[in-house]
Amino acid sequence: MGKRKSAAKPPPKKRMDKLDTVFSCPFCNHGSSVECRIDMKNLIGEASCRICQENFSTTVNALTEPIDIYSEWIDECERVNNVEDDDGA
């Protein structure tokens, strides 16, 4: 008589990688110079460049991550550039 087969252990869950909190500046193109901070008390997120002192602020919610603030900044820069291009043409 043999031993009863034991149930296989479930595979371990994969850990998600942390998202970046420092990014390259869209104005001076300096890598790792933009730092994002989230103030949950006042519901404000701020991205600022340490080199050229450019900054961007936006409203945040409980699910907002630093990459969201940076992405909004990039989107706003592109929107402003497109408006200026349309006015000049």
UniProtKB/Swiss-Prot annotation:
One of its GO terms (biological process) is transcription elongation by RNA polymerase II. GO terms for cellular component: transcription elongation factor complex. It holds the Pfam family Zn_ribbon_Elf1. Keywords: Metal-binding, Nucleus, Transcription, Transcription regulation, Zinc, Zinc-finger. It is found in: Nucleus. Zn(2+) binds at residues 25, 28, 49, 52. InterPro entries: Elf1 (IPR007808), T_Elf1_sf (IPR038567). PANTHER family: TRANSCRIPTION ELONGATION FACTOR 1 HOMOLOG (PTHR20934:SF19). Transcription elongation factor implicated in the maintenance of proper chromatin structure in actively transcribed regions. Belongs to the ELOF1 family. This is Transcription elongation factor 1 homolog. It comes from Oryza sativa subsp. japonica.
